[in-house]
């Protein structure tokens, strides 16, 4: 879910899994399908909003990484995403996802500016954190080098909104959706999350619909 340009989808396909990628960005899926053509993998991509996604049947596992769920800024809508996940999982199927925490947006990223020069691509990342709503707005300005030119860069601008969640909030949403909450891990230490965990992995499971 939220497969983006298909990088993780391709990696999982490398391990022999049959993959379906779901994303609501045509541009992202276009890049994903270019990667599919290069690799020759049999991956099905679907242009769908994860809040309303539909599959042709149930699957053994659903994965959502790279803070895709943080783009769902209303808890009620995220609960509905989890209900759909539960609906499309095989009996006792597993759901793996990650999310950025309130701590990360408030204490690490909030109201900061990040700038980086990577040669062919440079960016300025300007963050604004709204504490009451737990929402982080970031304005991203990209400078991407044009093919065949050393001096010409094209500028692109994007604005994104992501909501931070606490582990307690996320656990409640998972359980209210009908899924069974199994485990949580700090994304860096792979141990039990702490108050200062910035990204958390969640393992949940279908257990009867």
Model-derived segments and their meaning:
Residues 70-72:
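A short His-aromatic
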Residues 54-61:
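A short acidic, Gly/Pro-enriched loop at the edge of an enzyme's catalytic core
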Residues 96-171:
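SAM-dependent methyltransferase
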Residues 161-209:
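C-terminal lobe and adjacent flexible extensions of AdoMet/dcAdoMet transferase-like proteins
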Residues 2-4:
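Class I SAM-dependent methyltransferase "Motif I" SAM/SAH-binding loop
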Residues 7-52:
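Class I SAM-dependent methyltransferase SAM/SAH-binding core
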Residues 79-91:
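A short glycine-rich, Lys/Arg-flanked "PGG" loop and its adjoining helix->strand segment in the class I
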Residues 65-67:
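Residues lining the SAM
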């Amino acid at each position: 879910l939220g497969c983006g340009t298909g990088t993780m989808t391709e990696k999982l396909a490398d391990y022999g899994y049959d993959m379906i990628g779901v994303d609501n960005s045509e541009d992202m899926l276009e890049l994903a399908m270019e990667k599919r053509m290069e690799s020759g993998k049999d991956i099905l991509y679907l242009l769908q909003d994860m809040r309303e996604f539909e599959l042709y049947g149930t699957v053994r596992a659903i994965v959502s990484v790279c803070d895709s769920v943080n783009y769902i800024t209303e808890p009620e809508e995220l609960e509905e995403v989890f209900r759909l996940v539960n609906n499309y999982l095989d009996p006792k199927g597993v759901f793996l996802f990650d999310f950025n925490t309130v701590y990360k947006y408030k204490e690490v990223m909030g109201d900061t500016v990040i700038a980086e020069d990577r040669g062919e691509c440079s960016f300025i990342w300007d963050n604004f954190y709204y504490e009451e709503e737990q929402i982080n707005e970031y304005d991203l300005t990209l400078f991407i080098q044009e093919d065949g030119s050393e001096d010409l860069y094209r500028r692109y601008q994007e604005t994104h909104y992501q909501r931070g969640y606490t582990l307690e909030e996320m656990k409640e949403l998972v359980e209210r959706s009908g899924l069974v909450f199994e485990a949580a891990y700090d994304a860096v230490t792979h141990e039990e999350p702490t108050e200062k965990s910035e990204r958390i992995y969640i393992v949940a499971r279908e257990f009867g619909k």
